[in-house]
Amino acid sequence: MSDSPVTLPESIKLTEYSHGAGCGCKISPKVLSTILASQLPVFTDPNLLVGNQSRDDAAVYKLNDDIGIISTTDFFMPIVDDPFTFGRIAATNAISDIYAMGGTPIMAIAILGWPINKLPAEVAQQVVDGGRQACMEAGIMLAGGHSIDAPEPIFGLAVTGQIALTDLKQNDTAKAGDRLYLTKPIGIGILTTAQKQKKLQDEDSHIAVNAMCQLNTIGTTIAKISGVNALTDVTGFGLAGHLLEMCQGTKLTAKLKFDAVPLLPRALDYLALGCVPGGTHRNYDSYGEHLPELSEHQKAILCDPQTSGGLLVAVSAEAEAELIALLDAHHIAPICIGSLETPTTEANVVLY
């Protein structure tokens, strides 16, 4: 099957129809906190194992003593011009939340907003087909969905998954001494901004796309390692933002080896050209007070919003070799980017 079954007129470029792109469209963490601060009485359900208290990747509901159901949704505006590829990336990103909990996806439904007076329905059909392709790669059906007439194109999924409760991983359960590993390089926001600014060279157009279309299926297997204490995916809040969620949920400090953070090819070249997404600045404004003093270069990398980014893994020293062997077997460079320690400073993240 071709990744682009219908040829688009040269005049149609999806990124020109939206003010934001991918997970860079996310509302900043600080504003989101205001939105989620409900004034209603607290309602609890003992079977809801994971809700929004820890800003985890998905909700988990206990069906019985052995099995839980995972529920998540994610959608955004175009991050690439090709509609099929946009749909595939958006779906891959949404499904990732299931893997980030250690689960297995079982079905998805589509969420589509479309400016029907600006873009042909045939273009939307290609977007949905891209979503179907990602679902097929994940082994699930795109079982339905909902659409509205919207001023800008939006696409994503609501995904349902299941998990053996013994394998459930959360973002706030790390332990002091855990090593930190990242399964995909950073730099997607930089490269996609280069495209939006029309600075991206044709020979580099595949770099971010290939990374964003890579499913995080390895999360299901990582979760079976008993020494993996916490797991999350790195998306719109950037590496620093999602690492902070892990630290604040466990009251630990992350010692981050900045020079060890893996970067996508050419990311530094485009960063030098000023390709910094607006989401980077929003991220830093939201949580910069919890970080050490950073250079502009460090901010641009650590706060770079990722779309369909990799998994951030916190693993005990005793299980580190098992994780490394698994990453090697899946052709993922096993690079330790730091560790989690008992706090010795007010900052949640320190660099060395």
UniProtKB/Swiss-Prot annotation:
Site annotation Important for catalytic activity: residues: 26
Active site: 23
Gene3D superfamilies: PurM-like C-terminal domain (3.90.650.10), PurM-like, N-terminal domain (3.30.1330.10)
Cellular component aspect of the GO annotation: cytoplasm
EC number annotated for this UniProt entry: 2.7.9.3
Family: Belongs to the selenophosphate synthase 1 family. Class I subfamily.
Protein name per its UniProtKB record: Selenide, water dikinase
Organism this protein belongs to: Shewanella baltica (strain OS223)
